[in-house]
Amino acid sequence: GPFDKEIDKQVVAIEQNGEKEATEKTGRSGCLPWIGEGWYRTIITIPEGYSNGELIFDGAMAEPHVWVNGEDVGYWAYGYNVFALDITHATGGCKPGKHAVAVHLQNVEESSRWYPGAGIYRPVRLVLHKEKYIKTWSNFARTMMVGGIASDHATAAEARLRVSCEAVVSKHDGMSVTQTLRDASNNIVAQETHYLSDSKTTDITLAVKNAELWSPEHPYLYTLVTELKEGGKTWDVVEAKVGVRDISYSAEGFKLNGEARKFKGVCLHHDLGPLGAAFNKAAFRRQISILKDMGCDAIRTSHNVPAPWQLEICDEMGMMVMAESFDMWKYPKCKNGYARFFEQVDTESVNRDGKPWWERDITNLVLTTRNHACNIMYSIGNEIPEQSSAEGLKYSKLMQELIHRLDGTRPCTQGMDKAEGAMWSGVWQEMDVPGFNYRVHLYDKGYKNSAKGYVLGSETASTVSSRGVYKFPVEENHGKQYSDGQVSSYDLTACWWSNLPDDDWMWQDKMPWVIGEFVWTGFDYLGEPTPYDEYWPSRSSYFGIYDLAGLPKDRAYLYRVHWRPEAKTLHVLPHWTWKGREGEVTPVFVYTSYPEAELFINGKSQGRLKKMDVSMADFLENRVEERLPWGEMGKFADP
C-alpha cells in the first residue's frame, strides 16, 4: 500500500493515554496520503419544473467549500457532518439545463487521532423542489405511546406516532399536509390530513392498531409518506422508513418495548479497514452481519457524526446506535483538530447563520438521525478534556438542552474517562446517561453520585491482540510489547488504562444498574496502533474483536459465548503448530457456551473443566467466567 512513515508524523504526548513526554508517533493517523488539498468538478442537470434546489453532502473530508456556476454557495468546517447548501440563486432559480459544480477540500497535518480519509467519501445528493415544498429535515416522526405490548415484545395492540413537518409556502390558504403510514406490504395502516392555518408547521398523530414493533430481533419498518397538497394538486411528496418502538431509561434500566435489556455494544470507527474511509454499503452490511452473529446489538459511532447510510442499514438489519458527535471541544487533542472550529462563529461564508460550529453540527446531527428507529441515544463527546471543569459543565448543559429541544425522545451521554473529575464538576450528574469510559473500579462510586439510578459502560475493555499470534509465557499484562510488533491472542493483554472483558462482564452481569457496554472496538481500524504507537511500521489498531479484514480474533468467540449463550459455540486456542516447543507446556484455552468441556490431546484426556458462577468478591480474587484454561493458566479455572 501507499504507506509512508513521514505522512503526518507527530512528535506528541498523547495525554489521554497518560503520556507526559512527547515522542515520535509514525502510525497515529495511518501513514496514508490523506493530507493536502483537492478539487472535485462535475456537471449536474436540472430538468424543467423546479424553482428551488439544494446540494446535500453526507460528509466530505475536510472543510468543503462549494461553488455552482462559479458562485460561492457555502462552506462547512466539520468533515464528518451532513450539510445542505441552497443552490437556487446560483442556478438562476433552477433554470433547466447543465450547471457546473466545484468542491474544494483540504486536510491539514495533526488534525486527527486516527485515519480520517480524504475527499468526498460519502454521497452527495441533488434535491430539487417546486414552488411549494416540505422543508428538508423538518419531518419528525416519534413514537408517543405503545400499549398492550405482546409477551414477545414484537407487537402491540396500539401505538401512536406523532409526525411534525414544516412547509415552505407563501400562503397557507387551501394548503394541506397528509401523513400516511404504510406497512411492509404497502397497506395503509394509518392516515390523517391537516390544513395549514396561521403556521407553516403541522403536528399529526397517527393511531396504529396491531403495531409491529422495531427491535434488533424484529427490525420491522413502516413507510411514512408525507404529501403537501393544494386542492387537487400535489406539490411535494417525501417518503421515509420509520420504526415504531418504545425506549425508556430509569432505575429499572434501559427498556426497549417494555423489556429490560443491557447493551451488548461495540464502538466502530468510520473506516472499513483495507477499503478505506469511503462508505460502502455492502461492506458495512457485512460488518453488521458479523457483529450480530456474535450477539452484538448496538454500535457507537466513534467518535463522529455517522453516515446516513449507516443508520439506514442499522434500521433495516436491527442494530441500535449511539450517535456520537465530537472527539474534542475547545481543548485540542491534536494540534489542528476540531477544537479550531468548536466555538468559532463563521462570519464569512455565504451560508453563515451567526451560530458557533458546535451548535450547527449538533443541530444537523439530530435533524438527520432523529427519524431512525435504531438511534437510541446521542453522545455529545468522547473523553473531553473539559469534563472536569466548570466550562465543561456549561457546554454539556448547552448541548444537551439543544438536543432536547430538537428531539425530546432520546437521552444524551458522553464518554467520561476522568469520571471523578466529572463528578466534581457536575458533568457526571448533568448527563441523561452517565457514561464511563473504562474505570470499572469507579462504577459503584459513579452510581452513588448520580440520581439517575444507572450507569453505562460507554467504552470498555480496550483489550488488544493480533489474530493468530500467541506469545509465551502466557500471562495477564498491560501493553506488553514484542520485537515483531504483535500482541498475543491469548486475550490477556489490556492497556494501562483498561481491563479484560471479564472485568466488564462481572459488573454488567452482577449489577442491575449497569445498563450495558460498548466495547473498544468491534473491528480494527486504520491508525492509533496502541501499544505500538512508536513502532514503525505499525499503523493500524490492535483493539478490534475482528481484524481489519473482518476475520475473527479469538476474542470474537469469547464475546459470542457471553453475549449469545443460547448459541452453540466451541472454540479452542491456540493453534497446534509449535516447532521448537516440544516438551514444554503450552496453555490451551477453550471458549464455549457449554457448561463444561473435556480436552483431549492425541486421544488422551487432559481433564474436564466446569464453569461456575461467582460473587463479586470471589471474582476480584480469581476470575472465573467464560474461559476454561488448561496448562500453566489453570489458576483461572475451577478444576
Predicted regions and their residues:
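An acidic-aromatic loop/edge-strand motif
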Residues: G1-G30, Y78-G79, H89-L161, V169-M175, ...
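Solvent-exposed, conformationally flexible loop/turn segments
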Residues: E37, P96-G97, E158, S197-T201, ...
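Short strand-edge motifs at loop-to-beta-strand transitions and within beta-strands
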Residues: Y40-T42, N81-L85, K200-L206, N622-E626, ...
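Core beta-strand residues in small-molecule sensory/regulatory alpha/beta domains
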Residues: W67, R182, E227-K229, K255, ...
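Extended substrate-binding grooves/exosites of carbohydrate-active enzymes
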Residues: E71-D72, E110, P123, E131, ...
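Extended acidic/polar, glycine-enriched regions
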Residues: G92-P96, S164-S248
